[in-house]
């Protein structure tokens, strides 16, 4: 799995129009916090269980993808869930997996707020909100 900084990920998407851009956050996070245009939501885990099912996740991504060699870009809140999700996809046979380091919102700052230090939104990249 390749690690891409948000600006690199955006440029990578522009260079790979055939890529599948997957938001692995819970659907409610994606809708209310915001998400990049064109991303599809396939949660790594969902409320109330909050327990990932790697096989189910990989199966859903496989249904959305054109094949296991399709380029994939994964995004979550801060770049942690995508590490586990990406490993699960590689274990399931996906061969071209990237993830956005720092995710959509990035790390917490000294005041426990996100999107102020790093992340897709902090970098001023395109996003939308419900």
Predicted regions and their residues:
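Rhodanese-like catalytic fold shared by cysteine-dependent sulfurtransferases
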Residues: 1-19, 27-71, 82-130
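Conserved G/P- and acidic residue-centered "switch" motifs that form tight phosphate/ATP-binding loops
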Residues: 23, 79
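Short, surface-exposed ligand- or partner-binding patches at beta-edge/loop junctions that are enriched
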Residues: 75
